[in-house]
């Protein structure tokens, strides 16, 4: 059924298709229909970051930036749902067109630029949702906030979402906000992590609960840079790392229509690059920090490969767009079939 739906949706512009899909998934969630249409995946419980997940396959941030369809996505069988990226103030993002499909490569290029309705609107949607499962909220900085003041934006968002999130993801790796990726390195990263960790401690006392913090990183790093990031995350007391965001590389899409568009590339071409980052992280972290893997999962076996590489959880984005809800169950089944450690 999804194959037919995809054929119809792909006749529309990518952003129109995205918005319509979000509306349909949201409506299905409100009516309780999504769970009837999709066969529920097996229960494969896993405990990560002190949280109990019904299965290790989640929705990656970016598909539901404003929390418009939380219940709908949950009913499709995701073990957890991550919404955002959200910023302190609403912002329109980059000019359209800003999403491009590359179906020959099962890939997407986007330069959305953190378009969202702001953290207050997102929280209104979270409070209206019935979902009681694991909810991640992904936070970023506004486009017009100088990079040297980015920590202020992250703290504003953290303060607001803390009481409503199961975990919070700090996005320092989108390629579509100028200067953002510089926050992944050196003193900039150290200062950001220290500020976040201190605020997390303060908020834990205020709210009587500790909400884990995850940092989402880019795939466009050397092994040495990845190791330094891993060490910084451990030293600062972060709770998880999400690997990875989209890539600036165009390997795998050379010569394709839209292959030279600016923005971040996701989908099948980023798979090996992202999985390599997971392996480097796993070797360095040695179990001290869990890894959430995202990037290029278009078949169930790819999810299992991420777990085998050292991840504890996986997330879907582009693969979900190309393959539909069936990919959730296929990924859960493939992970469940892995030999037990």
Curated annotation (Swiss-Prot):
It holds the Pfam family DHO_dh. It is found in: Cell membrane. Its EC number is 1.3.5.2. Keywords: Cell membrane, Flavoprotein, FMN, Membrane, Oxidoreductase, Pyrimidine biosynthesis. It catalyses: (S)-dihydroorotate + a quinone = orotate + a quinol. The keyword Cell membrane applies. CDD domains: DHOD_2_like. The active site is at residue 174. Gene3D superfamilies: Aldolase class I. GO terms for biological process: 'de novo' pyrimidine nucleobase biosynthetic process; 'de novo' UMP biosynthetic process. InterPro entries: Aldolase_TIM, DHO_dehydrogenase, Dihydroorotate_DH_1_2, Dihydroorotate_DH_2, Dihydroorotate_DH_cat, Dihydroorotate_DH_CS. FMN binds at residues 61-65, 85, 138, 171, 216, 244, 267, 296, 317-318. Its cofactor is FMN. Pathway: Pyrimidine metabolism; UMP biosynthesis via de novo pathway; orotate from (S)-dihydroorotate (quinone route): step 1/1. GO terms for cellular component: cytoplasm; plasma membrane. The keyword Oxidoreductase applies. Monomer. This is Dihydroorotate dehydrogenase (quinone).
